[in-house]
Amino acid sequence: MSDTFLEIAYERARQAQQRQMKRRRAAAHRAARGPAPARAPRASPTQRTGTAHEDQALRLLAGAGLVPLARNLHCRAGEIDLVMRDGATLVLVEVRARANPRYGGAAASVGRAKRARLLRCAALLLPDLARRHWGGRIPPVRFDVVAFEAGRADWLPAAFTL
């Protein structure tokens, strides 16, 4: 082996060691600073509007005596906006808003397909909700809709059933 070949090999090994040492120092520095603060994902204007309507619906229902249990429960079938308790009844709430009533309004937007998705989602989430809040017994279930149109909230209790 020639001296040039050995010099090149030595130089590459030295550079690799320096890179590794630099990585270790950076990792130690990051560890000393602690974990990065968790950032909430930025919401689109539509998502912010939806969250505001859900907040209003939650205040409306809590003011009527319902007890909030969960919010925005996701499952593979979809999402349930609000989960409330009304005495011994589990109340699953869909919040809908429409700025323009031209196409039937907010309440009418909970059509057959949306109701079917909510029913599938409820069937998937019900065992866990019953275990957590009703000691494992399946409670009576009611589906309510809170519809926002023209700045007004309409609460439709028992909009449809299981």
Swiss-Prot record:
Gene3D superfamilies per the UniProt record, alphabetical: 3.40.1350.10
Top-level taxon of origin: Bacteria
InterPro entries linked: Restrct_endonuc-II-like, tRNA_endonuc-like_dom_sf, UPF0102_YraN-like
Region annotation (Disordered) ranges: 15-52
Family membership noted in the UniProt record: Belongs to the UPF0102 family.
NCBIfam families membership: PRK12497.1-3, YraN family protein
Bias type Low complexity, positions: 33-48
Listed SUPFAM superfamilies: Restriction endonuclease-like
PANTHER family attached to this UniProt entry: UPF0102 PROTEIN YRAN
Cleaved signal peptide residues: none
Protein name (database record): UPF0102 protein Bpet0439
Compositional bias annotation for Basic residues: 20-32
GO MF annotation terms: nucleic acid binding
